[in-house]
Regions:
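Glycine-rich active-site loop/strand segments that organize a redox cofactor
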Residues: 62-92
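N-terminal Rossmann-like FAD-binding beta1-loop-alpha1 element of flavoenzymes
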Residues: 22-49
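Active-site substrate-recognition segment that forms the wall
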Residues: 99, 108-115, 202-204, 219-301
Length: 301
């Protein structure tokens, strides 16, 4: 659905052929790679981005489109394990990552159906108590005042379901169309004179005393620095990272556009939702008012 939805926005880019030189070679054309390229280009550096498939092809273009701060462990767990100093640094980074999305959208005029607000829905009374404690903790420790506690009745009204015990509305969260955002970053990078190449598979990386040589199936880039932004698609390029990857699959379905009556009943304020199940469910409405629903996580080694 995402890919079919952006055919008019998609511009093809050339394969990397022959030899090139730059300051930074970025491998990977998703959110991380494109954002890295934009920041480097803003500093006046010559940048080349190499993507093995199409820009936004990987997880950046296939996710649920939801935007949240914090970390998967929970910032309170980080603080207990590593101390308040590191926890505060990680919290600031997570919040800056959310702010950066809005900054990019404003700066480059990216049209990606961005909406504000997300609900974390509690599937048990115990989880609701955790939400209450976590909200107070974030207000007191990190001065984060975007969290509104919702009782069961309010969650029922916001989600159109009686399944949940309550939840928290995070006004700093949100959702967007991920491939539209990725392609907006591509256009932003291009405006900053970043050289962009698709369908170019990196086969080998040679580190010399003065440079890095990035070899593809049809060409080579000689760069002062390399940024590996490959996510799980890093096989053969960095064994240290590759050995720390565990494949984790999640599944997403998309409905037909909902009727106006159903839209008013389900997510009337257009918030995104995720719940507290270990294999969580997450869902939102698209700009065309389709339900984008994900869950059923699978792991393999």
């Amino acid at each position: 659905y995402y890919a079919q939805n952006i055919e008019t926005l998609k511009k093809p880019y050339d394969q990397l052929i022959d030899n090139h030189e730059c300051d930074i070679c970025v491998v990977g054309g998703g959110f991380s790679g494109l954002s890295t390229a934009i920041e480097a280009a803003k500093k006046g550096l010559k940048v080349i981005v190499i993507e093995q498939n199409l820009f936004g092809w990987g997880a950046s273009g296939r996710n649920g489109g939801q935007i949240w701060n914090d970390v998967s462990w929970g910032i309170d767990v980080i603080e207990k394990k590593y101390g308040i100093k590191l926890a505060r640094q990680i919290w600031d980074i997570s919040q800056a990552s959310v702010d950066l999305i809005d900054d990019r959208i404003r700066e480059f005029g990216i049209e990606c159906d961005k909406k504000n607000g997300g609900i974390s829905a509690a599937t048990s009374a115990a989880k609701l108590r955790e939400y209450e404690e976590n909200r107070e903790y974030k207000i007191k420790t990190y001065n984060y005042n975007n969290l509104e506690l919702l009782d069961k009745n309010n969650v029922d009204k916001e989600i159109g379901s009686s399944l949940y015990y309550g939840g928290v509305l995070d006004k700093g969260a949100g959702h967007l169309h991920p491939i539209k955002y990725a392609l907006g970053l591509v256009k932003a990078a291009e405006k900053l004179n970043v050289k962009l190449y698709e369908r170019s598979v990196v086969t080998k990386i040679n580190q010399t005393s003065h440079a890095v040589e990035v070899l593809t199936d049809r060409g080579m880039v000689k760069a002062k620095k390399i940024a590996l932004c490959c996510n799980a698609y890093i096989k053969g390029l960095n064994l240290g990272i590759e050995n720390r990857i565990m494949p984790c699959a999640t599944y997403i379905v998309c409905t037909e556009p909902l009727s106006q009556n159903l839209q008013r009943e389900i997510l009337p304020n257009d918030y995104c939702v995720s719940d507290t199940n270990f294999d969580l469910n997450y869902y939102r409405l698209s700009d065309s008012k389709r339900m984008i629903f994900g869950g059923a996580v699978g792991y393999s080694l």
